[in-house]
A protein has these predicted regions:
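N-terminal mitochondrial targeting presequence
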Residues: 1-25
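TRNA-recognition modules of translation machinery and tRNA-sensing kinases, especially anticodon-binding
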Residues: 21-288
Length: 288
C-alpha cells in the first residue's frame, strides 16, 4: 500500500522545496532564534527553517511516513501517546545531560550544534524530550519533530531534518515481579533485560516490514553504542539489492531512568530519521 502511494507521489516528492515565508514571519523567527548571546551561532538561514512542520503535512513524504508509523503503533496492544508539536528549543540538560552525553562529547560543540545561549539550543535529536515525557508519567509514546545539526549540505545531509522517537516502559508483571535493578551488571545479564530487548526487536522488525509494505523484508541487527541505551542496536534492511541502515535503538540506560525517578522500571527506546525512509521509499535523490 505505502509503496504504491510512494510510486504515485514520486514526481511530486522530487519537486518539494523549502517554503518561502512572508517577511513578517521571517522577522519573528530571526528575533526569537538569533539572540545576540555570545554563544549564539544560529544564522538567519537556519532560523527560517524552524517551524516548517513538514511532518504534519499529510501529503508530504515526511507526513506520509509519520502517519504510516503511527498507524502501526496504533494497532499494537500497548497504547502509545503521540507528540508532534514540542518546542525545538531545549536545554543542554534535556538534550545532553539527561541522556548520559558528557560535556566533552563532540556533539555538544558549537561546530556541531546550534546554540541560542550557553544553555539553550535547537534540539539535535527528538530524544531530548524522552526524560521530559517519562517524568510526566507517559509510559509508552512517540515523539516526532524537526531537529538541527551543523552538517555540511549535500545530497544526503541538511542542517534541518526530522526524527521520530519511540519509548516503552514495562510493568512489574512483565519484568517477572522484579523492581530492584540496583546491580547494573546483573541487570544486563538478566532474563528481564532479554525480555525487553526481544520485545524491542520484534516491535521494530514489525514496524519496518509494515512501513515497507513487505512482510518478507530481510532485516539484520548489529550491536552499537549510544550513551542513553545499553545494550544498543542498529537495524538494517535489505532493499533493492543493498543493506540500508534504518534506525538505532536499545534498552533504556539505567542511569537515564534513575534521573527520571524510575529506578524500579525498565524499557526500550528507538529513534529514526524520517528523511532517510522517505528518500528510499519515494526515490528522492536529494534531501534538499
Amino acid at each position: 500500500m505505502l509503496l504504491a502511494v510512494a510510486r504515485a507521489l514520486r514526481p511530486v516528492a522530487r519537486s518539494v522545496r523549502t517554503q518561502v515565508r512572508p517577511r513578517s514571519t521571517v522577522a519573528e523567527a530571526e528575533s526569537r532564534f538569533i539572540t545576540g548571546h555570545p554563544d549564539c551561532n544560529v544564522t538567519p538561514y537556519i532560523a527560517n527553517l524552524v517551524g516548517r512542520d513538514l511532518h504534519k503535512k499529510s501529503a508530504h513524504p515526511l507526513g506520509i511516513i509519520k502517519d504510516r508509523i503511527e498507524a502501526y503503533f496504533a494497532g499494537l496492544e500497548t497504547s502509545y501517546d503521540v507528540f508532534d508539536g514540542e518546542d525545538p528549543v531545549v536545554t543542554t540538560t534535556q538534550c545532553f545531560d539527561d541522556l548520559n552525553i558528557p560535556p566533552e562529547h563532540p556533539g555538544r560543540s558549537k561546530s556541531d550544534t546550534y546554540y541560542l545561549t550557553d544553555t539553550e539550543l535547537l534540539r539535535t535529536h527528538t530524544s531530548a524530550h524522552q526524560s521530559q515525557h517519562l517524568r510526566q508519567g507517559h509510559e509508552a509514546f512517540l515523539c516526532t519533530g524537526d531537529v538541527y545539526r551543523r552538517d555540511e549540505i549535500d545530497a544526503s545531509h541538511f542542517p534541518a531534518f526530522h526524527q521520530m522517537e519511540g519509548v516503552k516502559l514495562f510493568s512489574e508483571e512483565e519484568m517477572n515481579g522484579q523492581t530492584d535493578f540496583s546491580d547494573k551488571e546483573a541487570w544486563l545479564a538478566s532474563p528481564e533485560c532479554d525480555i525487553v530487548a526481544k520485545d524491542l526487536k520484534a516491535t521494530l522488525e514489525g514496524l519496518i516490514k509494515y512501513v515497507f509494505d513487505d512482510p518478507d523484508l530481510q532485516t539484520r541487527w548489529r550491536d552499537d553504542y549510544f550513551p542513553f541505551t545499553e545494550p544498543s542496536f542498529e537495524l538494517d534492511v535489505f532493499y533493492q539489492d543493498e543493506w540500508l541502515e534504518v534506525l538505532g535503538c536499545g534498552v533504556i540506560h539505567a542511569d537515564v531512568l534513575e534521573r527520571c525517578g524510575l529506578a524500579s522500571r525498565r524499557g526500550w527506546a528507538f529513534g529514526l530519521g524520517l528523511e532517510r525512509l522517505a528518500m528510499v521509499l519515494f526515490a528522492i535523490p536529494d534531501i534538499r
